[in-house]
């Protein structure tokens, strides 16, 4: 397949008002999607549009709506909702596509567009290529009698809450549990507190007062220290932090210790194995901590690594018949419960596992020993990152680094595809060995640059 012109690994994203993240481009994008969906159809396609809480969402929602309606597609406006909720609603409302206006964990001045298929899954490469091709064609408005219509959906919140509840056993309850929720001033701000309270938890909420500008600003899964401090302050059993669009989740235990995606993957894998729910191979990424790989091996749980990005984790799970995977950042996939990464559903799976195993979050992690890991970004003065990584002296240094940590960790290089940077990562069970190996390997990359 030829290189993508607009789409990245997770839709289209960037700074508002710069490049393609502009109202006129999003208008054309909506029109392109509408034209792709109407091809070969006599019936008007239906497209759902959701968004997070950043202020530019209003502008892009209107632009998408206009472009789609002009192409002859009907639109349902969902309003602020978690990204995975749009995936679910696209499927359950029998829509032909779902669109989310969000830049996930990025600051308010960024925004982006993500797409879902009729099945509530990320678009395949062929459909993305068709949309890109349509973008290079003139804007088209159908005859007046074929124009689409737009309505605002009123029952989306209730539908999604019931979907989340259905992901755990019918008798599941959180009575007696005190938790802190950090909603990142984002798309989960109204849903998550309601859901966890309905399940019986005592909920202390932070990061749930969005103003369009404060999404992810010092709150949420990218600023876990705030959650940890609040857990300690109010004596909660644990804390849960989402990112701005609700597809990531991180936690803090009762002592305020941060719990990342690798930790949560371990809790779920071990519990699911014991209950017979675990199938296939657990999938992580190149960045998944070596300690998790070793801990799963000790439990005889097969594990494999995919490229960084939940798109690639999902692909590996589907190809290998697995249902559990995730990233250190908190993108967790529980494919027997949701078609995409869902922060709320993932949090419920962890809480259900802890309840079934009669363990606190801290106790559930006592058998997992992660190793020190560090990444250094080496910025290049010239030359492509891929060419630097493939240079003979860099490859020799990489082989030496891998030999130094063999059986105790890993060493690898990742050339950036978007900037002149080589990411150098080393992890080892000894911090001194890790740092020494990292210094040597990153030095070799700098010398080659």
UniProtKB/Swiss-Prot annotation:
Listed GO biological process terms: carbohydrate metabolic process; peptidoglycan biosynthetic process; UDP-N-acetylglucosamine biosynthetic process
Cofactor note: Binds 1 Mg(2+) ion per subunit.
Catalytic activity: alpha-D-glucosamine 1-phosphate = D-glucosamine 6-phosphate
Modified residues (Phosphoserine): 104
UniProt cross-references to Pfam families, sorted A to Z: PGM_PMM_I, PGM_PMM_II, PGM_PMM_III, PGM_PMM_IV
PROSITE patterns reported in the protein's UniProt record: PGM_PMM
Post-translational modification: Activated by phosphorylation.
Assigned EC number: 5.4.2.10
Keyword terms of this UniProt record: Isomerase, Magnesium, Metal-binding, Phosphoprotein
Stored PANTHER family: PHOSPHOGLUCOMUTASE (ALPHA-D-GLUCOSE-1,6-BISPHOSPHATE-DEPENDENT), PHOSPHOHEXOSE MUTASE
Entry similarity comment: Belongs to the phosphohexose mutase family.
Name of this chain's protein: Phosphoglucosamine mutase
Gene coding for it: glmM
